[in-house]
Amino acid sequence: MDKPGLSYKEAGVDIDAANRSVEMIKKWVGQTIRPEVLSGIGSFGGFFALDLQKYQEPVLVSGTDGVGTKLRIAQMMGVHDSVGIDLVAMCVNDILAHGAEPLFFLDYIAIGKLDPVLVELLVKGVSQGCLQAGCSLIGGETAEMPGFYREKEYDLAGFAVGAVERSRLINGSSIADGDLLIALPSSGLHSNGYSLARKVLLEKAGIKLEENIAELGHSLGEELLCPTRIYVPAILALLEACEVKGLAHITGGGIVENLQRIMPSGLGAVIDSQAIEIKPVFKLIEKLGQVDKSEMFRTFNMGIGYIIVVSPLYHDKALKCLRDKGEKPILIGRVEKDREKVSIQ
């Protein structure tokens, strides 16, 4: 008698588990839906009807990103419900830097063995991030990839689309000598520099993730999994209140490289390092890893998550607007001509 042939499930891909996960995430996705969304989960594509009455000449702004090796910390700790917030933050904060209001988001989850409970936790985090950003989670993909990832390993990618009036598109071109730099604090490492952080703190120093660290006031794992801040509400309010010349999301490359990306030719900036409240986790990495200060500023955000460039005329108004939104803005520097680079002093 012939033996029965192999099934897809025996090969490592469980379609029934995938269907269960879809049912489990529907409640989280549903919480994010804006009126412009025309489709539900299960379609081949997500439908979003742009409200053209809000714009004279709309420009769509898109961005994609991941969470990087911060996911390794989440997987080591078995904590999966916050990295989805990181995923949304990394994408929406980028498109926000051009003045765009985030409209919708899509996620991609690649996993070794599909666990519906784990997928639900990941999507729960994504939905929480979307709620913070005011955008809809309108689609996604979960790929079970046995033999490519270990059973409990996964990776995340996200895609955000927003819109801005063409005349209000921000690209840094109007930045001028003497403009001021206002910074918004980060919550910690956000989602960058984790390869160096793990090398120093886990491998070199031998600290356990569950170990409480006096300098931090909690465990190392809690610090490393603190979600990336989403700056959308504060920045959108600021854009309505005053003229903003440039916005920089401080991610990989730190303050120097990300701020330089928006500077016109012939202009640079001077950052006052004394104005920056460097968070304890960065001091810990610098000390235990004997990492040079310049390398720290080139790798990590050092406590600054977003930088806003405004004319001195709007300085006071910008600070008030940001404080009214619950932010703690600080003046950290100014734009200067004939520098061609950003320097930290």
From Swiss-Prot:
Record localization: Cytoplasm
GO molecular function, one term: phosphoribosylformylglycinamidine cyclo-ligase activity
GO biological process: 'de novo' IMP biosynthetic process; adenine biosynthetic process
Keywords for the protein's UniProt record, in alphabetical order: ATP-binding, Cytoplasm, Ligase, Nucleotide-binding, Purine biosynthesis
Pathway: Purine metabolism; IMP biosynthesis via de novo pathway; 5-amino-1-(5-phospho-D-ribosyl)imidazole from N(2)-formyl-N(1)-(5-phospho-D-ribosyl)glycinamide: step 2/2
NCBIfam families: purM
Gene Ontology cellular component list: cytosol
EC number: 6.3.3.1
Disulfide bonds: none
Top-level EC class as recorded in UniProt: ligase
Pfam families: AIRS, AIRS_C
Family: Belongs to the AIR synthase family.
Species lineage: Bacteria, Bacillati, Bacillota, Clostridia, Eubacteriales
Catalytic activity as recorded in UniProt: 2-formamido-N(1)-(5-O-phospho-beta-D-ribosyl)acetamidine + ATP = 5-amino-1-(5-phospho-beta-D-ribosyl)imidazole + ADP + phosphate + H(+)
Superkingdom to which the source organism belongs: Bacteria
Protein name stated in the entry: Phosphoribosylformylglycinamidine cyclo-ligase
